[in-house]
């Protein structure tokens, strides 16, 4: 039996009828963090000797950009599927960067995005060479010393 739990729901100010090509369809942002205890197997079976984790990092914007949007501007969300004893579990979590927390508090985008003019930034204390960009920590992940690390 599949047990689905909502872990957290982050505030999003994106419009419900958003039609930006990088925020619709398969690119549609998710603002909910989930835990699925037993993922339903649609066909076949998960081998009992399969033991491991598949993880990926994706971009999930929560707020309208200041002017222009590039997919790398979305906040990082790690998705993970854990396989053990013929069962798969799923979790997704936002990477809670300083930038994500500040924008959640303010309810708006604060830093200029990759395709924006840096002068449009509301805050200029970003982590990149431009200074006015948020490190969304959304494009890569590595495992080092038993920890999953994300990066811009």
Residue ranges and their predicted role:
Residues 1-152:
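Beta-propeller domains
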């Amino acid at each position: 039996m599949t047990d689905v739990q909502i872990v957290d729901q982050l505030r999003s100010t994106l419009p419900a009828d958003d039609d930006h090509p990088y925020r619709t369809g398969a690119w549609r942002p998710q603002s909910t963090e989930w835990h699925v205890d037993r993922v339903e197997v649609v066909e076949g079976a998960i081998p009992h000797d399969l033991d491991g984790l598949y993880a990926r990092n994706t971009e999930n914007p929560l707020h309208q950009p200041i002017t222009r949007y590039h997919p790398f501007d979305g906040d990082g969300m790690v998705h993970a599927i854990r396989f053990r004893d013929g069962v798969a579990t799923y979790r997704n979590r936002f990477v809670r960067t300083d930038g994500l927390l500040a924008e959640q508090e303010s309810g708006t985008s604060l830093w200029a995005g990759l395709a924006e003019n840096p002068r449009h930034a509301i805050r200029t204390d970003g982590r990149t060479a431009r200074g006015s960009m948020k490190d969304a920590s959304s494009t890569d992940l590595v495992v080092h010393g038993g920890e999953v690390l994300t990066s811009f």
